[in-house]
């Protein structure tokens, strides 16, 4: 059973993971198995994104992700670059996904209505989403943040001002709102930062 002594295996595997390459070796976090996505995972990832768009709209966040975002092309690029991760349950079913990308992010170079607390190296989390049958969505976020903090001391992330769910999750996990950044298309996003204690 792969989930026996998962925390023991997690420490062994994570100690051997390369920050640059994100080895495909599994890492266990909060009963979830996190691994690099493959092209075979794309249909499930796109399904989770579709569910996330529905959840956003039901909660009043109507504009963050249009129907075409995140596109299959974006997912393929994330996978090709080794940035797309999936969170799997004990049966191996993908219940969440996120992109973990080493900084610097060009859209974070300028921040308005505030400032970044430091200029230390960081990783950026983009396109985080959980399936509707994943149970508590915060568990996917917890897995994502814990996994990323094993690779960096600082995480930056942004979200739409209307994404009440994500604002709540970020606050719950100790992220601090630093200001507003502009995406490449000029759309504003609330920018968050957390440094590992």
Region locations from a protein language model:
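A short beta-loop-alpha structural element at the N-terminal edge
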Residues: 33-47
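Conserved beta-hairpin
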Residues: 81-98
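A short helix-loop-beta-strand connector motif used in the catalytic cores of GNAT acetyltransferases and
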Residues: 73-86, 103-107
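Conserved active-site alpha-helix within GNAT-family acetyltransferase domains
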Residues: 162-179
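Conserved acetyl-CoA-binding loop-helix of GNAT-fold acetyltransferases
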Residues: 135-150, 168, 172
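Conserved acyl-donor/pantetheine-binding loop and adjacent beta-alpha core of acyl/acetyltransferases
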Residues: 99-136
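Conserved GNAT acetyl-CoA-binding A-motif
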Residues: 150-161
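Conserved GNAT-fold acetyl-CoA-binding loop/helix
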Residues: 53-73
